[in-house]
Amino acid sequence: MALLAQQLPRRFNSVKLTSFIKAKQVTKRSARAGKAVLPGFSAQPLLSSDTSFLRRGIKTYRTLFWNRFHSASTNRTKSSAESTLLPSVAEQQERILSLESELPLEEVDDLPPLSPLQSVSEEEAIQIAAYSPLPISSFTLADYVDHSKTLQKLVQLGVDLSKIEKHPDAANLLLRLDFEKHIKQILLFLKDLGLEDNQLGPFLTKNYAIFSEDLENLKTRVAYLQSKNFSKTDIARMVKNAPFLLSFSVERLDNRLGFFQKELELNVKKTRDLVVRLPRLLTGSLEPVKENMKVYHLELGFKHNEIQHMVIKIPKMLTANKRKLTEIFDYVHNVMNIPHHIIVKFPQLFNTRVFKIKERHLFLAYLGRAQYDPAKPNYVSLDKFVSFPDKIFCKEIAKASLNDFEKFLKTL
């Protein structure tokens, strides 16, 4: 027994714990250095997993210690066990395993320094498990992906973490969430709404805050839309094109629908069709809408019923850039001499780039074909004028080749 007691400290001191001790020292230094790091997002929710990495390291090296001690002492014990009162190999193993389980994490600091030249067998090297330290603070979620199953599953869904990490609050939110408890139920809810698998990633990249919403509140908002006779297909389309729609309360959604119905003097069906085609009318600011309504009426001279007709056909006119609207109207009305009543029939003019309208009109004027009055021969439809690609425009309307059109553009 005395012989074993003398051998045990020497064997224990020879265990190669260098890597583990270094890992623990690095962890301590990281904790101190974290105070000096610029404000990013913290990994506090994941620190418990870091501790488990540390304990697995202890277990690995304890196992190596036992393997070494067992192989070195077995031969000696066989020759002396019969003539002495030393315990058997099985008893030694039981005691060593007991020692392994009783070694606390705090006693690692008290271990004596080990020689860096001490060799490790190939079998022991294979058993060494290396775990990268978890950063205390970081400016990128990429540092936490290997440690977080939640982030890994979000990446698999197609979520762009590089966009979310620009918002520290959102990044911290994701680090605190558990996929099974908090995220899975939201994904199933979105799937029930009609979103496809390839649509979940882009949706969650834009509206990551939906994970902080109460599921019952989300269901209540969907039920409200259904009560307004929005079909399941309509709701899926609206949620896809306006990801923040479900983050709006029922009261706010009701106020927005009421605003457009009153402002444009639309019936319920036309109001519903309007927001289905452009659902961001319900989520965006109302100031551009109010401003454009004034521009159409006061600056461009359209009547209320004319504005209503154009907006129903091209909902984007409500949120278009004011400067673009005035430039297009000025050129179409004052240069091309197209009156209001014809513009009202072709509101897609306001959804076209100004330079495209100029190029095509000048080319038709050069050829003597710039005739936009439907009551006269050789009439050019403004719908085809703006919608046809260059090749078809040249063939069907200008009656010229694409090469001639490209040469003409070089003269402008």
From Swiss-Prot:
GO terms for molecular function: transcription cis-regulatory region binding. Its main location: mitochondrion. It holds the Pfam family mTERF. Residues 1-67 form a transit peptide. Binds promoter DNA and regulates initiation of transcription. Required for normal mitochondrial transcription and translation, and for normal assembly of mitochondrial respiratory complexes. Required for normal mitochondrial function. Maintains 16S rRNA levels and functions in mitochondrial ribosome assembly by regulating the biogenesis of the 39S ribosomal subunit. The lineage of its organism: Eukaryota, Metazoa, Chordata, Craniata, Vertebrata. It is found in: Mitochondrion. GO terms for biological process: negative regulation of DNA-templated transcription; ribosome biogenesis. GO terms for cellular component: cytosol; mitochondrial matrix; mitochondrion. The gene is Mterf3. The keyword Lyase does not apply. Keywords: DNA-binding, Mitochondrion, Ribosome biogenesis, Transcription, Transcription regulation, Transit peptide. This is Transcription termination factor 3, mitochondrial. Belongs to the mTERF family.
